[in-house]
Regions:
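Hydrophobic transmembrane alpha-helices and their immediate loop junctions
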Residues: 2-189
Length: 189
């Protein structure tokens, strides 16, 4: 009778650590994906804002350049309230939605050269950068798929990049202030 219980005891003693390590690995994977999500979201917003500043610079306005805002340094783009406090409060309260914003890049339309579409260029530059990042994500997916390098984790990371940037592009096209769509709509009509 003791022989029948030995395998059961061995399975039980190995089963608990195995379950623990699977849960532990899943927790680490969720943490990695969460950190990646935050980094991608933040830098997608930074690229979006830099695009506005660069479009203004291209049209003759040096305001963003002189303010040091044409940089990938994320600290220059952090809005304490919109980039830190609002997302933190939403996270702590287990909100189903998490959002925030960066400091808008300053520009002065009176400095624009004789380009009647300069305001539209500046407003649409951020959206175009987000759509470009979606395009790069799709290209990366197809390239990795072609070379047979894809796995579930890589697909998940690429999906995060694409989804964040699709959301940012379409959200910013809404014709309500302060979204870029409002500026575009205002200039056209």
């Amino acid at each position: 009778m003791n022989i029948n219980t030995i395998p059961l005891n061995i399975q039980a003693s190995f089963g608990i650590p195995l379950k623990f390590s699977i849960i532990y690995l899943q927790t680490i994977q969720i943490m990695i994906f969460s950190i990646f999500f935050i980094i991608v979201l933040f830098y997608s917003i930074v690229f979006h804002e830099i695009a506005h500043g660069y479009a203004a610079y291209r049209n003759g306005d040096m305001t963003a350049y002189n303010a040091g805002r044409l940089t990938l340094n994320p600290i220059k783009h952090v809005d304490i309230f919109g980039s830190v406090l609002v997302p933190l409060i939403l996270f702590i309260t287990n909100s189903p939605y998490l959002f925030g914003w960066a400091k808008p890049v300053p520009y002065n339309p009176s400095n624009f050269k004789n380009n009647k579409y300069a305001e539209i260029e500046v407003a649409s530059a951020g959206v175009l950068v987000n759509l470009f990042l979606v395009f790069i994500s799709v290209l990366a997916f197809h390239a990795l798929n072609y070379f047979n390098i894809l796995n579930q984790d890589i697909v998940g990371l690429i999906k995060i990049i694409a989804q964040i940037n699709i959301f940012l592009a379409f959200f910013n096209l809404l014709p309500f202030p302060p979204a870029d769509g409002f500026s575009i709509f205002s200039e056209l009509y």
